[in-house]
Amino acid sequence: MAGVMSVKDFIVATKYKLIRKIGSGSFGDIYVSINVTNGEEVAIKLESNRARHPQLLYESKVYRILQGGVGIPHIRWYGTEREYNVLVMDLLGPSLEDLFNFCSRRFTMKTVLMLADQMIGRIEYVHVKNFIHRDIKPDNFLMGIGRHCNKLFLIDFGLAKKYRDSRTRTHIPYREDKNLTGTARYASINAHLGIEQSRRDDMESLGYVLMYFNRGTLPWQGLKAATKKQKYEKISEKKMTTSVEHLCKGFPAEFPMYLSYTRGLRFDESPDYMYLRQLFRILFRTLNHQYDYTFDWTMLKQKAQQSQSSGVPGTNTTTQGATVPSAGVPAGVAPGGTTPQ
């Protein structure tokens, strides 16, 4: 958008005024914007109408189908403004990747289990609506703001795909000639092998996200290769040769149980979401945790605020060396598409 016009001149649907850019991705740029009629802040995604692979219209249609679900951002408007496709939606808080960095790249078991419960619920809702997400990763889960600050939102449906007919419930056919869609770090083994993705792949990807939060890194991160294709092959090989037991070593048995279950699902099989939620809920109770929405970052932010109010300089922006994530991250700040790790 730089060089085309100034931000202050850009008004969407006669009432949404762009304030500042807060992100960008493969689709274009994201701005915090304000509804000039009531002062409400929203997020706006802009995509050039000359984009080689436009996805914003498709994403807006998926969002429309998902509207009303818990943890699904509300869509305010979609249309074109000047030379841009525009999606106006809820403004959300930081992503789980942002918060993971804020917490020095390690979450406590309590936080992981509280997140797992919400994450399984979000993915189940998308599946009930006949879609698979195909890019489950920490960047695509955002916390809400204000009264929704403890609610987890699932975003970025540019790679989502309808896996069954909404009327006949006929499942898409099994295929083995697919390119990897999504993010290699969290991709299922079958996705690496070129097998058409289905519900099982979203659930397996979530298992890798949870172990990433537990461990801090995954064994297939940081692999070096000359080309993207070779890197994907290395990640795939490492993933296939790392046993579930080794990946989850030192963590409760529920995590290898989760991954073994999801890897064992048939192509068109519906995951038993309640079984998976119960795995983690029972573990949560066994560990004597309280589901009080006190996440790791809640504690850190409270400490930062206390330090600030007590007059300690320099503590309002960082804690443990990480920038305090603030509200004002849009629904959809994470770039879509395939990424190398």
From Swiss-Prot:
Organism whose genome encodes this protein: Caenorhabditis elegans
SUPFAM superfamilies: Protein kinase-like (PK-like) (SSF56112)
Polar residues composition bias: residue spans: 306-320
Region of interest: Disordered: 306-341
Active site: 135
Domain of life per record: Eukaryota
Binding site for ATP: 22-30, 45
Residue stretches making up the Protein kinase domain: 16-284
One Pfam family this sequence matches: Pkinase
Protein's recorded name: Casein kinase I isoform alpha
Keywords (A to Z) from UniProt: ATP-binding, Kinase, Nucleotide-binding, Serine/threonine-protein kinase, Transferase
Keyword Secreted: no
Gene3D superfamilies, per database record: Transferase(Phosphotransferase) domain 1 (1.10.510.10)
InterPro entries: CK1_Ser-Thr_kinase, Kinase-like_dom_sf, Prot_kinase_dom, Protein_kinase_ATP_BS, Ser/Thr_kinase_AS
Catalyses which reaction(s): L-seryl-[protein] + ATP = O-phospho-L-seryl-[protein] + ADP + H(+); L-threonyl-[protein] + ATP = O-phospho-L-threonyl-[protein] + ADP + H(+)
